[in-house]
Curated annotation (Swiss-Prot):
<dbReference type="GO" id="GO:0005912">
    <property type="term" value="C:adherens junction"/>
</dbReference>
<dbReference type="Pfam" id="PF00412">
    <property type="entry name" value="LIM"/>
</dbReference>
<dbReference type="GO" id="GO:0051371">
    <property type="term" value="F:muscle alpha-actinin binding"/>
</dbReference>
<dbReference type="GO" id="GO:0051393">
    <property type="term" value="F:alpha-actinin binding"/>
</dbReference>
<dbReference type="GO" id="GO:0003779">
    <property type="term" value="F:actin binding"/>
</dbReference>
<keyword id="KW-0440">LIM domain</keyword>
<dbReference type="InterPro" id="IPR031847">
    <property type="entry name" value="PDLI1-4/Zasp-like_mid"/>
</dbReference>
<dbReference type="GO" id="GO:0015629">
    <property type="term" value="C:actin cytoskeleton"/>
</dbReference>
<dbReference type="InterPro" id="IPR001781">
    <property type="entry name" value="Znf_LIM"/>
</dbReference>
<feature type="domain" description="LIM zinc-binding">
    <location>
        <begin position="243"/>
        <end position="302"/>
    </location>
</feature>
<dbReference type="Pfam" id="PF00595">
    <property type="entry name" value="PDZ"/>
</dbReference>
<dbReference type="GO" id="GO:0030027">
    <property type="term" value="C:lamellipodium"/>
</dbReference>
<dbReference type="GO" id="GO:0005925">
    <property type="term" value="C:focal adhesion"/>
</dbReference>
<keyword id="KW-0966">Cell projection</keyword>
<dbReference type="GO" id="GO:0001725">
    <property type="term" value="C:stress fiber"/>
</dbReference>
<keyword id="KW-0862">Zinc</keyword>
<dbReference type="GO" id="GO:0030018">
    <property type="term" value="C:Z disc"/>
</dbReference>
Amino acid sequence: MPQNVILPGPAPWGFRLSGGIDFNQPLIITRITPGSKASTANLCPGDIIVAINGLSTENMTHNDAQERIKAAAHQLSLRIERAETKLWSPQVSEDGKANPYKINLEAEPQEFKPIGTAHNRRAQPFVAAANIDDKRQVVSSSYNSPIGLYSSGNIQDALHGQLRSLIPNASQNDPAPAAVPQSDVYRMLHSNQEEPSQPRQSGSFKVLQNLVSEEDGRPVGTRSVKAPVTKIPTGLPGAQKVPQCDKCGSGILGTVVKARDKYRHPECFVCSDCNLNLKQKGYFFVEGQLYCEAHARARMRPPEGYEAVTVYPKC
């Protein structure tokens, strides 16, 4: 259903367009800025713009529509179409006539119950009534206990303990305590609790102790004990020693450079004069010192009648 919407100027209007004849789509509002003039005028995303300031948008491109909206300085008049929202409802026929189905949207009254009125407020076990007339209840315990705790006698004791706090005269009706059975197990348990006993030894330990005492001739329970001796670890005979650097004298761990049965670090394999690293280069030994070619020539003077020739080692 077409609607006329007027936005008071000036810009910004607070909505975004999409579509146009160049997109083969109608001009549609895709976004509304909250609190903007478009939001105040109740424009919604999805509204189709039919006319802008009285001009039909049927043959307008997207840029033409933007220019028309920008040209509106004082007010912007839009004619929009908004899709109607329909709710499905079943059709009920009465006497051959179709009538819409009536729905009662009135809320049903519910009984108000505050939170906590129907809960066990104190830390007491929940009980289920077995006989209301006799006021006897069966306690359901949820503890991991032996079966004996759930016997009729224990349940009755727990019942009387609860009735004492509820009924003032309940203590007069308490049954007399039953006689304690004088069994062998009962007497053994109580004798262990009342009289402290000496620590007991197992039969196998006694036999072993007697055998040891008979062989050694020493009194029972004593034996000679020597303090443990800590052995000093010694080096293995086949262990490989760490090579020593010929220049700095420290051990070499990792890459080793060997020249004439002498070991050096890669960073110590340098000329003794200019400290030039001789790795991947020619090196010379003069009087036990390592030199580059230039400084080796300066220190080595051949005898008269001989000429110095550089000889490189075979790789």
